Amino acid sequence: NNFERDIERRQMRDEIYRRDAVETYKYDGTVQDLLDNPNDISDFIRHHLEAQVPRLQMLDDYYQGLNFNIMRNKRRREKHLADNRAAHDFASYITDFINGYCFGHAIQVQSDKEMTQSKLNELHSLNDVDSHNRSLGLDLSIFGRAYEYIIRNQEDEVRFYKSDPRNTFVIYDTSVEKNSLMAIRYWKVATEDSVELTEVESNIYYVDVITDQATYFYEANSVTNLELSERKPPEAHSFGKVTITEFSNNEKRRGDF
């Protein structure tokens, strides 16, 4: 598709055409093997940052109408000629139309058992599931993937949240069943408003590693090759599964534009 390929964007050509930009992460080992070898987790995070995030960010820019060739300052060689091209939001039109078509009618989850249905209704009401599903659908259309994060909060409530594909991924085993080993969430601690930070401080990432038994909390720094160090003790959970689920728009993990 022309939005995603954008053949004139020479400065980003390597990022656009990287075949591993839609790679599904797999690990030939157990969850404990990964936890015992944190450098392997760092390698996955580094690859996601370098190979996948640039493409995902570009797709989000297109959705917001930030067309690279139109928005850049020097966009044509003939400086003496006019350039009246205008930025457009065709990507937004495509995504919003498809999202409305797919999720305009709420997904129904029903049970024949009255007590079960009552619990489902309470859960759906608490989490505004219809809006939540539409939000997941938006990410599916833009990025080709979406992530749902389930937690039990301090009030002992089960809550559903969306996790950004630009800082979330799942690592699977190598079996044909494609079982989730763990999910990774990471984010940069420093913001654009942060001032007077050293080079080390401005490149710190917080990393959450979610397994089927617990969530582990790490700190990493791009200056030290994203080497992980524990930032606080792990917290056990009782879900018995990795609580981040990845949804794909299609087999190729491609969006709608």
Residue ranges and their predicted role:
Residues 1-161, 177-178:
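Extended, helix-rich architectural segments
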